[in-house]
Amino acid sequence: MTKLCLLLLPLVFLVSYSFAEEEITISISPNANPVQKPIGHQISLVCSIKKTDSNGEKPGMIWKKHGGLDRTGNVEVKKLDDYTLGLIIRNSSVEDSGVYYCQAQVGSKVYMNKMDVIVFEDIVFRDKQLHFGQVLATASVNISCEVSAKKDSVITYWTRHGKQILEGGKHKFYSRGSILEIQNYQPEQDAGQYTCEVFHVSSGSSNTKTVTLGTTGEKNYVACQQMCNSFCTDVHNKVFTNN
């Protein structure tokens, strides 16, 4: 009987030790993960340790981020109590985006949790005009998709009726592609909708704007012409494909 007790003692100790590990939890608030905020907003994270055992040992707690917390100078860490550590990002920038780790050490054991933070550029168009109405033939028309973000941090993609607009011929781009110039404007050819989509490279945020040129009659004429061309092309392809 004594030998059996001695054999079971390590097993009992192992079970008790594992159970003690499960009683320690580390959590980060807010509960939403990732945290997403526009540039310039304040972001607050709170890391908490829940410890139900009674030995009274206080955890050592730190915040970490790949590349360091002090790259932008916007991050401040505050100890709220022995089991709670806060992190504040003031006047947040895109560079403050990333994965933030809260690490706690209790005895020889290290616990960790993480929170994804995404700071995105709020893409706002400077020119609000969406319709030009009647445009004189042979005139030059400029359509602006300039935004509040820095020009070198965005990419602008232009389309007309679903097809990409490339520079050349009567189309020219200025201001790193944010302004489209249509030279020698011809209503029966150039009227219609022009769409730009602006992408912010670092944060991945985007915005879309559609500008309409020409009167209703001119737009309908161009749309009808495009439908006819598309129909003729389909018929032509089917005839020659079957032959």
UniProtKB/Swiss-Prot annotation:
Gene3D superfamilies membership: Immunoglobulins
Knockout consequences: No visible phenotype. No defect in the positioning of ASI and ASH neuron cell bodies. No defect in the positioning of PQV, PVP, RMEV, HSN and AVK axons in the ventral nerve cord.
Database matches in Pfam families: ig (PF00047), Ig_3 (PF13927)
Glycosylation sites: 91, 142
Signal peptide, first to last residue: 1-20
Subcellular localization(s) per the UniProt record: Secreted
InterPro entries for the chain: Ig-like_dom, Ig-like_dom_sf, Ig-like_fold, Ig/MHC_CS, Ig_sub, Ig_sub2, Immunoglobulin_dom, Neural/epithelial_adhesion
First-listed, main subcellular location of the protein, grouped into a coarse class: secreted
Residue ranges annotated for the Ig-like C2-type domain, each copy included: 30-118, 133-212
Tissues of expression: Expressed in head and tail body wall muscles.
Designated name of the protein: Zwei Ig domain protein zig-6
Coiled coil segments of this chain: none
